[in-house]
């Protein structure tokens, strides 16, 4: 755990300030949770440092004896975590284009819109197909995406399982500033193969510290899958 925390700390950057600066292209990034890197959902703020997260994303931190802020790693009092009402108001005020159809939607409704957008669903249909990691005599289904191995989005190194991808990116691309598509997320039913993470390494360390393939029912939505996998992975530790 100590090693994981040190890797997370080394990958973190300052949380960008909320506001409309930067136009539509940067609006989602300014209102993105530093843990899941998606638009805030039921945002909460830590009283001591002021950093904001989705309520669900911060929950695991609140269940440990001495919680640390996931962004700055400073200790905080879990009783002094409150709803970020000012952020919620801004989410309802600002609009940004959908990644699929480019329709402008308020940030508060962006997640719901993306889950039903036909253009996004078309993009999801083009995700990588399943390839067995070893030769097999069994027939290979044609409609199962590859969720076993991934290619590095920075250098193209292939056939990396999830743990190998995390290790490879931490060791080889720690300082790479490029925005890239998460190959793990894009292989999921809810993934967007065209969405580039503003801080991929931070996303990788926070969002993919356990295997979806081990814990997830792929028929449920992304947030339910993440919470179920996180709970099950913690119960095995």
Swiss-Prot record:
Name the GO cellular-component terms. cytoplasm
The pathway that the record names for this protein is: Protein modification; protein ubiquitination
Keywords attached to this Swiss-Prot or TrEMBL record, sorted alphabetically, are:
Autophagy, Cytoplasm, Immunity, Innate immunity, Metal-binding, Transferase, Ubl conjugation pathway, Zinc, Zinc-finger
Q: Which PROSITE patterns match?
A: ZF_C2HC_RNF (PS51803), ZF_RING_1 (PS00518), ZF_RING_2 (PS50089)
UniProt zinc finger (C2HC RNF-type) residues: 98-117
**Which positions are annotated as binding Zn(2+)?**
98, 101, 113, 117
GO MF annotations in UniProt: ubiquitin protein ligase activity; zinc ion binding
Name the record gives this protein: E3 ubiquitin-protein ligase RNF166
Organism (species): Rattus norvegicus (Rat)
Question: What's the gene?
Answer: Rnf166
């Amino acid at each position: 755990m100590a090693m994981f925390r040190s890797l997370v700390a080394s990958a973190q950057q300052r949380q960008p300030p909320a506001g409309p600066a930067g136009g539509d292209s940067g609006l989602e990034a300014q209102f993105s949770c530093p843990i899941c890197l998606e638009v805030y959902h039921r945002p909460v703020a830590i009283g001591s440092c002021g950093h904001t997260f989705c309520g669900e994303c911060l929950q695991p931190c609140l269940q440990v004896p001495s919680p640390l802020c996931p962004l700055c790693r400073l200790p905080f009092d879990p009783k002094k975590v409150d709803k970020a009402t000012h952020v919620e108001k801004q989410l309802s005020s600002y609009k940004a284009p959908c990644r699929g159809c480019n329709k402008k939607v308020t940030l508060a409704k962006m997640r719901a819109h993306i889950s039903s957008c036909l253009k996004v669903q078309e993009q999801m249909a083009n995700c990588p197909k399943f390839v067995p990691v070893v030769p097999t005599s069994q027939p290979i289904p044609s409609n199962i995406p590859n969720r076993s191995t991934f290619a590095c989005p920075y250098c193209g190194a292939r056939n990396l399982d999830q743990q190998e991808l995390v290790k490879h990116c931490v060791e080889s691309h720690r300082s790479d500033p490029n925005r890239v598509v998460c190959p793990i997320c894009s292989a999921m039913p809810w993934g967007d193969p065209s969405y580039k993470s503003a801080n991929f390494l931070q996303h990788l360390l926070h969002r993919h510290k356990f295997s979806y393939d081990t814990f997830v029912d792929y028929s449920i939505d992304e947030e339910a899958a993440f919470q179920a996998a996180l709970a099950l992975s913690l119960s095995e530790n």
